[in-house]
Amino acid sequence: TTGPEVIDDIKTRLDRVVAKYAEQLHEVATTLVHDTYLQRFEGVEGDLIAKDAALVEDLEKDFNVTLPQAISQDKGVDAVRHVVEAMQVKLDKARKLLVEAEKGRKDVF
């Protein structure tokens, strides 16, 4: 799986977080956030840090603080969706950086 594919998967999983929250399955939503961070985001984190450390730091905060708090404090579907949408914008930027990194690797070989 390439870095950009992992980002696409993360975005899909975050959409599911909003859906689970909307279904009042807050624990499922929170678990999905943590699993997505540990199983998917951490896998591309190294490549991203080299390109944009601040972006990685922002996303880590979103995954570990902002989104879980929006869920645990029961801020409502719109608030959770707003956090996810902000994360999606950052993930789009991360995806572009990973596409560039992949191109760079192919040019080397």
For every predicted segment, state its role.
Residues 1-109:
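Soluble extramembrane regions of membrane proteins in the secretory/endomembrane system
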